């Protein structure tokens, strides 16, 4: 199931812009204090570092990801999720000529 709408949240209006604009996200906070981010990654290959564990939920487009210590790229498309451990690195790539990867990042 794809998350299409999120109700009852507070949105940080200033965007987080990474990698010269190849990744742009906004922080959201739920009434219970839970924090997530929603964003988009344009065609590129990027490396991220995590603090807390993350679940990346694809809501549109697709990407390939590679967790630290792995040589394999794994595809993630709309409606799919993948988990990244805390205090880890992972690579994510969106192929040129394809739709941007739209995501919700669930922390913790």
UniProtKB/Swiss-Prot annotation:
It catalyses: a purine D-ribonucleoside + phosphate = a purine nucleobase + alpha-D-ribose 1-phosphate; adenosine + phosphate = alpha-D-ribose 1-phosphate + adenine; cytidine + phosphate = cytosine + alpha-D-ribose 1-phosphate; guanosine + phosphate = alpha-D-ribose 1-phosphate + guanine. The keyword Glycosyltransferase applies. Gene3D superfamilies: Jelly Rolls (2.60.120.10). The keyword Repressor does not apply. Keywords: Glycosyltransferase, Transferase. Its EC number is 2.4.2.1, 2.4.2.2. GO terms for cellular component: cytosol. It is an enzyme of class 2 (transferase). One of its GO terms (molecular function) is thymidine phosphorylase activity. SUPFAM superfamilies: RmlC-like cupins. Catalyzes the phosphorolysis of diverse nucleosides, yielding D-ribose 1-phosphate and the respective free bases. Can use uridine, adenosine, guanosine, cytidine, thymidine, inosine and xanthosine as substrates. Also catalyzes the reverse reactions. Belongs to the nucleoside phosphorylase PpnP family. This is Pyrimidine/purine nucleoside phosphorylase. The gene is ppnP.
